[in-house]
Amino acid sequence: QLHCAGKAKRSGSHAPLVRELLLDALSPEQLVLTLLEAEPPHVLISRPSAPFTEASMMMSLTKLADKELVHMISWAKKIPGFVELSLFDQVRLLESCWMEVLMVGLMWRSIDHPGKLIFAPDLVLDRDEGKCVEGILEIFDMLLATTSRFRELKLQHKEYLCVKAMILLNSNMYPLVTATQDADSSRKLAHLLNAVTDALVWVIAKSGISSQQQSMRLANLLMLLSHVRHASNKGMEHLLSMKCKNVVPVYDLLLEMLNAHVLRGCKSSITGSECSPAE
């Protein structure tokens, strides 16, 4: 289980109800402000002075991802209602979406820089720099294409905040818990996802466009999430491949997340005996 997912449990039998009522009391505007306050800080990674090699680029990217994952867990816990889900559910959601959240954050940072990927303020990559890493150019192209579409839509910061939270809350395709673990967990999650969706609808409505344009914009934004998921799947496959080939060592929280992905794949695969978590 995620060692950073939080150890604090609910204090008092009425705490979950009280916090749920607090979520109900938040207006869409207040929820968006809460998401803004939850935003993680920029992470620095310091680009190597020498030209990138396959190993050095993958090392920079995995170090950055590991640092960002720690902040991602803190971010998720600041979303109103998230810590009221069972710890099991919190972990499963984060394990299911972490690559997507990293990628949509990358897209947002890169939105005003056509042709570039702003992994960090001090790690800006051109598309062609990916040529030194086998298989990563396809992923760079997917990231740049989806970022370009967000740019065409003139994605606003508050829209981005809502979309990123929705990626987290809508990330797990399988039932999260059994009735014996937490009977109302699915209800809590659906309630929270609805609240964030309402916040996104409110943000779009505040732009002043017509009702028809609002509906179209919402649809266009949500349709792009499948592209983020596709890029995430490709990124996960590539990272596993790089690790299996010993191109780059993977440690700490990133290794934990990667192993969780492998184990989930084993459980859902008929040929599960062929899978084994990375060591």
UniProtKB/Swiss-Prot annotation:
Has the keyword Transcription been applied to this entry?
yes
Residues in a coiled coil are: none
Q: Does Transcription regulation show up as a keyword for this record?
A: yes
Subunit structure of this entry?
Binds DNA as a homodimer. Can form a heterodimer with ESR1. Interacts with NCOA1, NCOA3, NCOA5 and NCOA6 coactivators, leading to a strong increase of transcription of target genes. Interacts with UBE1C and AKAP13. Interacts with DNTTIP2. Interacts with CCDC62 in the presence of estradiol/E2; this interaction seems to enhance the transcription of target genes. Interacts with DNAAF4. Interacts with PRMT2. Interacts with CCAR2 (via N-terminus) in a ligand-independent manner. Interacts with RBM39, in the presence of estradiol (E2). Interacts with STUB1/CHIP.
What is the protein name for this chain?
A: Estrogen receptor beta
Q: What does this protein do?
A: Nuclear hormone receptor. Binds estrogens with an affinity similar to that of ESR1/ER-alpha, and activates expression of reporter genes containing estrogen response elements (ERE) in an estrogen-dependent manner.
Q: Which GO terms describe its biological process?
A: estrogen receptor signaling pathway; positive regulation of DNA-binding transcription factor activity; positive regulation of DNA-templated transcription; regulation of transcription by RNA polymerase II
Top-level lineage group: Eukaryota
Q: What is known of its domains?
A: Composed of three domains: a modulating N-terminal domain, a DNA-binding domain and a C-terminal ligand-binding domain.
One Pfam family here: Hormone_recep
* GO cellular component entries: chromatin; nucleoplasm; nucleus
Q: Which CDD domains match?
A: NR_LBD_ER (cd06949)
The record ties this protein, via InterPro entries, to: NHR-like_dom_sf, Nucl_hrmn_rcpt_lig-bd, Nuclear_hormone_rcpt_NR3, Nuclear_hrmn_rcpt
From the UniProt record, which GO molecular function terms apply? estrogen response element binding; nuclear receptor activity; steroid binding; zinc ion binding
Give start and end of each NR LBD domain. Answer: 27-261
- Localization (cell): Nucleus
What Gene3D superfamilies is this protein classified in? Retinoid X Receptor (1.10.565.10)
Task: Cite the PROSITE patterns for this sequence.
Answer: NR_LBD
Lineage of the organism: Eukaryota, Metazoa, Chordata, Craniata, Vertebrata
Family from the record: Belongs to the nuclear hormone receptor family. NR3 subfamily.
SMART domains named among the record's database cross-references: HOLI
For this UniProt record, the keywords arranged alphabetically read as follows:
Activator, DNA-binding, Lipid-binding, Metal-binding, Nucleus, Receptor, Steroid-binding, Transcription, Transcription regulation, Zinc, Zinc-finger
